[in-house]
């Protein structure tokens, strides 16, 4: 993540974002609204070895937290430059329970749902 921030965002000043969005009149408001990519979107497509239950089950490893909670920093970084978040696609349990055909079918359904 740091490398992405260093190489993409830092060099993207003036191309990806103009400022942090705050105004001189009231510098406590408007933070995160200076992105230049308004109207564009981003979508995460992720693979995890963890089974879905590790995310969804209270008391399990991720304490019932959705994958997007774990990637909130990345979503907010993209929002900072003006991108709108699309629903994340997630393949779980990819090492101990590999199901390539299911993942491909699920991805196709996801793409059709998101992009029509």
Where is each model-derived feature located?
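Helix-loop-strand module that forms the ligand-binding subsite of alpha/beta enzymes
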Residues: 1-74
């Amino acid at each position: 993540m740091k490398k992405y921030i260093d190489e993409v965002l830092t060099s993207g000043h003036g191309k990806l974002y103009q400022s942090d969005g705050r105004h001189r009149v009231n510098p406590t408001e408007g933070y995160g609204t200076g992105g230049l990519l308004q109207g564009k979107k981003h979508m995460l497509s992720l693979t995890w070895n963890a089974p879905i239950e590790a995310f969804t089950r209270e008391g399990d490893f991720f304490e019932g937290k959705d994958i997007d909670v774990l990637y909130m920093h990345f979503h907010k970084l993209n929002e900072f430059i003006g991108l709108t978040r699309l629903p994340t696609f997630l393949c779980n349990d990819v090492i101990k329970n590999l199901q390539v055909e299911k993942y491909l079918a699920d991805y196709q359904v996801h793409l059709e749902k998101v992009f029509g």
